[in-house]
């Protein structure tokens, strides 16, 4: 790489991929390749004396993404098994980022009080730093969040989103999903989520089926029309799986994790594919990631919706 032009990101990434010579970057290592890719991206922006997000945009930035705040976590807690992984609040009518953060903080703090009143016990913090779900019933959880929103006076400014992570609730032997104390088929799960979208205001629902349940995603995308169906585990930032999802009309968009796809160039290519094929990408960090993650610059620079 010595002597290469830092402004030529594609050439740098291509060089590393060719030096590695494997399909999944096992020779040089995915972490090493990705770290160098990001470092070169930052260096190129710095040499132009521009913030990275501005360098990525290459022009006027018209808007910033709607922030998503994970306020309630599913999984097992105190004998309660909540199937859906993350209940998300989106202050989609906030006037700016500062107000969106203020709304989210107030709603989160109020939600702790609402949960305490519901259970009679101190709420616990979950693995993703939201409150632990106090009920197996997703509707109870959504109603409690809605009460917190209403109590704070933000009823007209907030919507929901869900990261269901239903791969974790899938029984591969019987081809059923755990939901609210029962095992259900993908048809029943799709019908249930459809009812939720008719009762509550959702921006998106992520990973509502198993990572290989292509038929289920196609059904969901066809049947559920009041919100966006997006994928993370289904697509894993993989170009072949993203293309298959597009061809099957299985999703509206997908989670794009740059260090999962491997290089900045490959991440930009995945985003470009989405933009050119009527889908959208949502950049995302990984658990345990750093505060200054490049995904923030990508989200703003690429004009990601949320």
Residue ranges of each PLM-predicted region?
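Beta-strand segments within the central parallel beta-sheet cores of soluble alpha/beta enzyme folds
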Residues: 11-14, 51-70, 159-164, 204, ...
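Glycine-rich anion-binding loops of enzyme active sites
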Residues: 31, 59-87, 131-159, 168
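Generic secondary-structure signature for well-ordered alpha-helical cores
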Residues: 2-6, 17-21, 45-46, 50, ...
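Catalytic core of soluble alpha/beta enzymes
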Residues: 121-122, 136-306
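Short glycine-rich or small-residue beta-strand-to-loop segments that form or flank ligand, phosphate
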Residues: 23-27, 88-90, 130-132, 253-257, ...
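Metal- or metallocofactor-binding catalytic centers and their adjacent structured scaffolds
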Residues: 1-48, 101, 130
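Mobile "lid/hinge" segments at catalytic clefts and subdomain interfaces of large enzymes
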Residues: 62-124, 129
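Predominant activation on well-ordered alpha-helical scaffold segments within soluble catalytic domains
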Residues: 13, 17, 34-45, 53, ...
């Amino acid at each position: 790489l010595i002597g290469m032009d830092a402004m030529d990101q594609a050439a740098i990434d291509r060089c590393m991929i060719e030096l590695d010579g494997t399909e999944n970057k096992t020779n040089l290592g995915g972490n090493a390749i990705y770290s160098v890719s990001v470092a070169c991206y930052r260096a190129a922006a710095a040499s132009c004396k521009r913030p990275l997000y501005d360098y990525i945009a290459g022009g006027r930035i018209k808007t910033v993404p709607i922030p998503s705040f994970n306020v309630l976590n599913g999984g097992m807690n105190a004998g309660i098994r909540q199937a859906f992984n993350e209940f998300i609040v989106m202050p989609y009518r906030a006037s700016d980022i500062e107000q969106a953060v203020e709304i989210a903080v107030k709603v989160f703090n109020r939600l702790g009080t609402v949960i305490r009143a519901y259970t009679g016990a101190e709420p616990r913090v979950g693995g993703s730093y939201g409150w632990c779900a106090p009920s197996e019933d997703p509707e109870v959880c959504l109603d409690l969040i809605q009460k917190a929103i209403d109590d704070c006076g933000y009823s007209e400014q907030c919507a929901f989103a869900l990261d269901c992570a239903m791969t974790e609730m899938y029984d591969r032997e019987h081809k059923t999903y755990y939901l609210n104390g029962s095992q259900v088929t993908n048809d029943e799960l799709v019908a249930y989520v459809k009812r939720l979208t008719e009762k509550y205001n959702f921006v998106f629902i992520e990973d509502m089926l198993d990572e290989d349940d292509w038929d289920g995603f196609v059904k969901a995308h066809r049947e559920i029309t009041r919100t966006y169906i997006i994928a993370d585990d289904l697509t894993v930032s993989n170009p072949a799986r993203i293309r298959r999802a597009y061809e099957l009309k299985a999703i509206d968009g997908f989670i794009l994790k740059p260090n999962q796809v491997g290089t900045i160039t490959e991440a930009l290519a995945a985003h470009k594919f989405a933009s050119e094929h009527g889908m959208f990408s949502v950049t995302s960090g990984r658990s345990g990631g750093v505060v200054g993650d490049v995904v923030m610059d990508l989200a703003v620079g690429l004009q990601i919706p949320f």
